[in-house]
Amino acid sequence: MEAKAKLSMIRISPRKMRLVADTIRNKAVLVAVATLKNLNKDAAEPILKLLNSAVANAVNNNGMEADKLYVKTIFVNEGPTLKRFRPRAHGRAYEIFKRTSHVVIVVSDEK
């Protein structure tokens, strides 16, 4: 059985989020939580919260046991980009892209 959790419009670029997502893919939930707590990346905190939400969904909605779960799939998609301008010399302006991410985690108890 599976349980899912989604996180939308997180203000971290998808490229940086994927680095963290790749470290916990196909790992046991307990190992993934320990990994995320010790990871020195800004993207680790929102992914840890999302993983805890997926585990809570599995336990409360489907009656699964938390210690038997593993991260079946995790993927990061690109959200809408906020476009800003930075003034530069001689009347120019550089465009600044503030990228957002959408993250989906699926946990399962079947290998």
UniProtKB/Swiss-Prot annotation:
Keyword vocabulary terms for this entry: Ribonucleoprotein, Ribosomal protein, RNA-binding, rRNA-binding
Disulfide cysteine pairs (residue numbers): none
A GO molecular function held by the record: structural constituent of ribosome
CDD domains: Ribosomal_L22
Entry keyword Ribonucleoprotein: yes
One GO-annotated biological process of the protein: translation
PROSITE patterns assigned: RIBOSOMAL_L22
Pfam families to which the protein is assigned, alphabetical: Ribosomal_L22
GO cellular component, one term: cytosolic large ribosomal subunit
Function: This protein binds specifically to 23S rRNA; its binding is stimulated by other ribosomal proteins, e.g. L4, L17, and L20. It is important during the early stages of 50S assembly. It makes multiple contacts with different domains of the 23S rRNA in the assembled 50S subunit and ribosome. The globular domain of the protein is located near the polypeptide exit tunnel on the outside of the subunit, while an extended beta-hairpin is found that lines the wall of the exit tunnel in the center of the 70S ribosome.
Record family assignment: Belongs to the universal ribosomal protein uL22 family.
Quaternary structure (record): Part of the 50S ribosomal subunit.
Protein name as annotated: Large ribosomal subunit protein uL22
Source organism of this protein record: Mycoplasma mycoides subsp. mycoides SC (strain CCUG 32753 / NCTC 10114 / PG1)
Gene name of this polypeptide: rplV
